[in-house]
Amino acid sequence: MKIRASVRKICEKCRLIRRRGRIIVICSNPKHKQRQG
């Protein structure tokens, strides 16, 4: 999980989700997991 100021989709399978007021990227590739901090 990377915590970044700006999250973006890295590949086609990345999905942007809003959870508890935070924007999260989930993907089949675990390296692409991101959270906005």
From Swiss-Prot:
GO cellular component, one term: ribosome
Pfam families with a match to the protein in the record: Ribosomal_L36
Main location, first listed in the record: plastid
Protein origin, superkingdom: Eukaryota
Gene Ontology terms for molecular function: structural constituent of ribosome
GO biological processes: translation
Record InterPro entries: Ribosomal_bL36, Ribosomal_bL36_sp
Chloroplast in keyword set: yes
Family: Belongs to the bacterial ribosomal protein bL36 family.
PANTHER family cross-referenced by the UniProt entry: 50S RIBOSOMAL PROTEIN L36, CHLOROPLASTIC, LARGE RIBOSOMAL SUBUNIT PROTEIN BL36C
Cited NCBIfam families: rpmJ_bact
Alphabetized HAMAP family for the sequence: Ribosomal_bL36
Protein name: Large ribosomal subunit protein bL36c
Protein source organism: Nymphaea alba
Encoding gene per record: rpl36
